A protein has these predicted regions:
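Gly/Trp-centered helix-boundary motif
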Residues: 1-165, 169, 313-314, 318-334, ...
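Alpha-helical transmembrane segments of integral membrane proteins
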Residues: 135-352
């Protein structure tokens, strides 16, 4: 007679799965990169050069500067995150005369009172900024935009996966456990949604509800639940016939108790693996929508938006402006795929 595993057996299997996952170097490499991206997303506003909201501080005089470019600047008091790039400065008594920065020289000369300017940690009114990855066509720091874009990608992945789990697991559990007309209705609905191309469905939802930061995230999530529901249903159909499920029914346990206490814990492994894959798909989908102008809207930083703004430079020496966000998308998606493969191997999803 097949019985339900004891808590001790479950704990031992969990420890064994964790050990297998930790030994997987590719999976751990992906997990480390994801962890770094999470840190950048959470603490990015403190770390990046451009500390404005959305990293959208535009300085047209600094447009399309090369990586490693440095510029001196002065900042006025009582004007947060406001700074003025300069090329020359000269102290004149209680004032300072500066030449505003222009890439071709010949900037306007302006005189400021020293009492109106902020001082840095060294007590100097003239400071320096370094743009490690250069600036875009609006004079914004590329590195700051990339760091800010990481939070958008991780947020869309998180929201989309949560929505897909909420819908997919719920419908899959109902269809697999209750069978009959419930299974027939839900399966028919799944097949209808499954037949519609994902990108086309997302675009239809965006057109119906409008573009926007949160609307796009919800739209992506509403298109990713189908596969979760199919996998959950298939797993539940097998588990519901186990003898320990029949025993739970015989002693009078309610359907909800059986589903959440005995069925759901036994279908989590493939759902976890699917969630990692869905996370990667959501990031790719959001980037594609942003590139098409249907995703996160300007000035919200998005790697897809950055590629859209800079793809015209692909045949010039500024091609890195489109290449860098593309690399970020590739690395983050690859990391989630490696973690997903590691979870699949560690949890023995294929064998089970």
């Amino acid at each position: 007679m097949e019985r339900e595993k004891s808590k001790f057996e479950v704990t031992m299997e969990s420890n064994s799965s964790l050990q297998r996952f930790v030994k997987n170097k590719l999976a751990m490499s992906g997990l480390v990169f994801i962890f770094l991206m999470v840190l950048v997303s959470v603490f990015g506003s403190l770390l990046r050069l451009d500390k404005t909201e959305n990293a959208n501080d535009q300085k047209l005089s600094l447009a399309l500067c090369k990586p490693g470019f440095s510029v001196n600047y002065v900042s006025k008091k009582f004007e947060e995150n406001e700074w003025i790039p300069i090329s020359k400065s000269e102290a004149i008594g209680d004032s300072i005369r500066v030449e505003l920065f222009e890439k071709n020289g010949g900037g306007e000369t302006v005189i400021f009172a020293l009492s109106d300017l902020k001082k840095d940690s060294k007590g100097e009114v003239v400071s320096q900024k370094k743009f490690w990855l250069g600036t875009d066509k609006y004079g914004r720091d590329v590195l700051s935009r990339l760091m800010a874009g990481a939070s958008v990608s991780l947020l869309v992945g998180t929201i989309a996966v949560l929505i897909s789990l909420l819908l997919g697991v719920t419908l899959g559990l109902w269809a697999g456990y209750f069978k009959g007309w419930v299974d027939a209705v839900i399966s028919y609905f799944i097949q209808v949604v499954w037949a519609i191309p994902t990108l086309l469905l997302v675009m239809a939802i965006c057109f119906a509800f409008g573009t926007g930061f949160w609307k796009v995230f919800v739209a992506v999530g509403l298109t990713m639940w189908v596969e979760v529901a199919r996998i959950t249903r298939g797993q539940v159909l097998g588990i519901r016939e186990k003898e320990y499920i029949e025993a739970a029914k015989a002693i009078g346990n309610s359907s909800s108790r059986i589903i959440f206490r005995h069925v759901l814990p036994n279908v989590l492994s493939p759902i976890i693996v699917m969630s990692a894959a869905n996370f990667a798909s959501a990031i790719l989908m959001e980037a594609g929508l942003s590139f098409l102008g249907l995703g996160a809207q300007i000035p919200t930083p998005s790697w897809g938006n950055m590629i859209r703004e800079s793809y015209s430079y692909l045949t010039t020496d500024m091609a890195y402006l489109a290449f860098l966000p593309g690399v970020c998308i590739m690395l983050l998606v690859l990391s989630f795929m490696m973690v997903g493969n590691g979870l699949r191997d560690a949890l023995d999803v294929r064998e089970n």
